């Protein structure tokens, strides 16, 4: 999982 949530 990435540090930033791109699934927003």
Curated annotation (Swiss-Prot):
Belongs to the actin family. Its main location: cytoplasm. This is Actin. It is found in: Cytoplasm, Cytoskeleton. Actins are highly conserved proteins that are involved in various types of cell motility and are ubiquitously expressed in all eukaryotic cells. One of its GO terms (molecular function) is ATP binding. The lineage of its organism: Eukaryota, Metazoa, Ecdysozoa, Arthropoda, Crustacea. GO terms for cellular component: cytoplasm; cytoskeleton. On the 2D-gel the determined pI of this protein is: 6.8, its MW is: 46 kDa. It comes from the Eukaryota. Keywords: ATP-binding, Cytoplasm, Cytoskeleton, Nucleotide-binding.
